[in-house]
Regions:
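Non-catalytic substrate/cofactor recognition surfaces at enzyme active-site rims
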Residues: 1-342
C-alpha cells in the first residue's frame, strides 16, 4: 500500500542529502574500469529435452542443487551470463583516494534467501571496501541485466552451500576483491560530460487471449482443484483480476558519466537484452541498471516466453507486452546515439 508519510519523509531526506552533497563538493577525478568476473553468476534457465525451458535443471525438483545431470531431462543452460564487472570510482583530486563507487554486476540480489531483511552480498562487499578505504566510502551497487541469472552453480556438485549467509558472504568478499582490483587499475575518464536522457514508453499490457496464456489456462482447468500447484492457483486468481486494456507508462533513463553510460530498465531485464544494449553502444563502458524507478516484473525475450518457465509466465511474472524487452533496448539505443552525438 502507498504510505503517504513515508513518501513525504523520503522527499525531505532526499532534499537534505542533496543539500549536504552540494555543500561537500570538492575537486575530484572520475576513473572507470571493468573486468570479467566468472564463477559467481549462472543462467538459471535450462533447456529441456522436450524443447521447453524452466527454472532449474530438474522438472520434479526445479530448485534442487544436487542433481545428477544423467537423471534429468536437462540439456544445459538456456542462455548466457554477462561477466562484465564495472566500476565508476570518484577519487579525491589531491590524494587519489576513492570516496564514492558505483559498482555494476549482473546477478540477482537474493542469495541470503528466506524472509529476512538484508543487504545481502552488496552489503558484505560494501563493508569490506570500507575496511580498506575508510568508513566514509559510499558504495552504490547497481544490479545489471539478471532476470534469468542467479548464484546457483547447478550441476557442479559444489560441497559448499549454494544459498544463505555463507554464500552471501562468499560472493560479497569475492566482489569486494574484484572491485578493488578494477578501481586500482581504472584510468581517469577522458570526458567530463554528465548528461541524462529520459524516454517514456507507452507499453501495451500482455493480452489475455494470447496463445501462451490460453494454453496454460486450459492445462490448469483440466486438473481437479486438489491437483493444482500453488502457482496454478495464483495464476487463476490473477487471471480473473487482470485487465489487458490500455497501456502503462514505463520510464527508460540513459545516464552518461564521462566515458561510461548507465542504461536503465524498469524491471528484471533478461541478460540477453543487456548484452544487446552493450553490443550496439558507441561508448567505451556501458553498464545496465535494472529495476530502475519502476517494477514491471520480468522482461524476458520473446523466445523465453514461447518456451515457458517461471520468469516468462504471463500475468504472474510479466504483465507488459512480449515486445517490452525490445522496446527498452531500442529506447536505450536511441538515447545512446543522441548522447554520443552531443
Amino acid at each position: 500500500p502507498y504510505d503517504e508519510k513515508y513518501m513525504a519523509d523520503l522527499e525531505a531526506v532526499a532534499a537534505q542529502v542533496t543539500l549536504a552533497a552540494r555543500r561537500s563538493q570538492a575537486p575530484a577525478i572520475v576513473c572507470i574500469g571493468s573486468q570479467r568476473e566468472e564463477g559467481l553468476a549462472f543462467n538459471r534457465r535450462f533447456r529441456m529435452k522436450d524443447g521447453s525451458e524452466q527454472f532449474g535443471p530438474d522438472k520434479q525438483h526445479p530448485t534442487a542443487l544436487d542433481i545428477d545431470e544423467n537423471d534429468t531431462d536437462c540439456c544445459g543452460p538456456a542462455g548466457p551470463t554477462d561477466p562484465e564487472f564495472g566500476v565508476i570510482a570518484v577519487k579525491r583530486e589531491l590524494t587519489g583516494e576513492p570516496f564514492a563507487l558505483i559498482v555494476d554486476y549482473a546477478l540477482h540480489v537474493d542469495v541470503t534467501s528466506g524472509d529476512k531483511i538484508t543487504s545481502d552480498y552488496p552489503g558484505i562487499m560494501r563493508e569490506q571496501l570500507k575496511r580498506v578505504y575508510g568508513e566514509g566510502l559510499v558504495t552504490l551497487f547497481i544490479q545489471g541485466a539478471s532476470g534469468n541469472i542467479n548464484h546457483c552453480a547447478y550441476l557442479q556438485h559444489s560441497p559448499f552451500p549454494n544459498f544463505g549467509e555463507w554464500k552471501s558472504r562468499q560472493i560479497g568478499l569475492a566482489l569486494a576483491g574484484k572491485a578493488m582490483n578494477v578501481l586500482e587499475k581504472a584510468l581517469p575518464s577522458q570526458s567530463s560530460t554528465v548528461e541524462m536522457l529520459r524516454t517514456v514508453l507507452a507499453v501495451p499490457r500482455y493480452p489475455k487471449d494470447d496463445m501462451v496464456v490460453q494454453k496454460l489456462l486450459a492445462a490448469i482447468k483440466a486438473k481437479k482443484p486438489e491437483e493444482l500447484a500453488f502457482f496454478e492457483t495464483v495464476f487463476i486468481k490473477l487471471y480473473n483480476e487482470y485487465s489487458d486494456e490500455g497501456t502503462d507508462e514505463r520510464e527508460v533513463l540513459t545516464l552518461r558519466i564521462g566515458d561510461a553510460v548507465l542504461c536503465s530498465a524498469p524491471g528484471e531485464l533478461f541478460v540477453e537484452w543487456g548484452l544487446e544494449i552493450k553490443k550496439w553502444s558507441p561508448f567505451k563502458y556501458t553498464f545496465i541498471a535494472a529495476l530502475c524507478n519502476d517494477y514491471v516484473g520480468y522482461i524476458p525475450t520473446v523466445e523465453a516466453i514461447q518456451r515457458g518457465g517461471y520468469e516468462a509466465t504471463p500475468i504472474i511474472s510479466l504483465k507488459g507486452t512480449s515486445a517490452l524487452g525490445q522496446m527498452v533496448a531500442d529506447a536505450n539505443f536511441r538515447n545512446l546515439q543522441k548522447l554520443k552525438a552531443e
